[in-house]
Amino acid sequence: MSGRVGDLSPKQAETLAKFRENVQDVLPALPNPDDYFLLRWLRARNFDLQKSEAMLRKYMEFRKTMDIDHILDWQPPEVIQKYMPGGLCGYDRDGCPVWYDIIGPLDPKGLLFSVTKQDLLKTKMRDCERILHECDLQTERLGRKIETIVMIFDCEGLGLKHFWKPLVEVYQEFFGLLEENYPETLKFMLIVKATKLFPVGYNLMKPFLSEDTRRKIVVLGNSWKEGLLKLISPEELPAHFGGTLTDPDGNPKCLTKINYGGEIPKSMYVRDQVKTQYEHSVQISRGSSHQVEYEILFPGCVLRWQFSSDGADIGFGVFLKTKMGERQKAGEMTEVLTSQRYNAHMVPEDGSLTCTEAGVYVLRFDNTYSFVHAKKVSFTVEVLLPDEGMQKYDEELTPI
């Protein structure tokens, strides 16, 4: 049995009754304490009564902490309202609301230099409540329960800038909050125009997604417009995505409903860096260099780094070894990222690189040009792996 209203086994029905009895003290504070709502928490924990109750009570604490009862009255900062991509537009063929996330135009540094992480998370929670409110309105309009949504992730333009660690951590926290506090609300997550980097991004988020959510993620290949039209009627799908829906002025992107973001003007920044904790620290003698090696087993991995120096600038470049088992000088290796000097003592430096071939990559901090000063360098380096399960879509993924 599916565990939904009208499709419960005797055991599931008994568990639902017991669950309602156990949480009767919080029922008045719930947004809608009907069987549909309670069954979401039971399904999320496989009808384990104790785990479902713990999850629901934790959700009540979350509602209080985030002031969810009044979050729709809250207005996000101007930067978010103008430049945070996404929006609610149309319904699928079953009447479920459709939410669009537009990844490419997202300006990671602009956002986090202009607003706080809490502002971003609160905005995402506000979006969740907007969507649930739309589900309630659809239920009234159609005369039948609408409790799930379709999410469309437009990955056109997904690039290395989106793997900036502070942004990734915000999205990881968001997906964690989504799983814990909005269970069983996702019908499908449709990925369109996925680039070659999508499997890497998916692998970063996967630990924060439940097995059930992962099963609902569908990567649409080259025929993504046809795929969307199977689920969404043309008149409910923006023309930009293959349908016939437009704004009143004929705009195919439906800008009155979907925000497409953009680069945030530096005049709106309130800080010039995000505080970073580094994993390693090394003292580099004057006239010397320091090399860090990372073995990349297959193409498509992403090297991501952050570093800062104390007191003065530092050189940095990335190389690929040509001989294994021995330390090579810069001139003996293949230069992958040209070595140059960075003012990392003034502003922390960060970057990333898609590894196009397997081998041992060397991140080289260069102080050979300094005959007077030693340099202390703090750094963090990560290897981001593509998800193996996504490799089957590789032929249809768009090159970045």
UniProtKB/Swiss-Prot annotation:
The keyword Phosphoprotein applies. The keyword Repeat does not apply. Gene3D superfamilies: CRAL-TRIO lipid binding domain (3.40.525.10), GOLD domain (2.60.120.680). Residues 76-249 form the CRAL-TRIO domain. The N-terminus seems to be blocked. The modification Phosphoserine is found at S223. Detected in a layer of supportive cells in olfactory epithelium, in the apical region of the trachea and in the surface layer of ciliated bronchial epithelium in the lung. InterPro entries: CRAL-TRIO_dom, CRAL-TRIO_dom_sf, CRAL/TRIO_N_dom, CRAL/TRIO_N_dom_sf, GOLD_dom, GOLD_dom_sf, SEC14/CRAL-TRIO_domain. One of its GO terms (molecular function) is lipid binding. GO terms for cellular component: cytoplasm. SUPFAM superfamilies: CRAL/TRIO domain, CRAL/TRIO N-terminal domain, Supernatant protein factor (SPF), C-terminal domain. Residues 275-383 form the GOLD domain. It comes from the Eukaryota. Pfam families: CRAL_TRIO (PF00650), CRAL_TRIO_N (PF03765). Keywords: Lipid-binding, Phosphoprotein, Transport. Probable hydrophobic ligand-binding protein; may play a role in the transport of hydrophobic ligands like tocopherol, squalene and phospholipids. This is SEC14-like protein 3. It comes from Rattus norvegicus. The lineage of its organism: Eukaryota, Metazoa, Chordata, Craniata, Vertebrata.
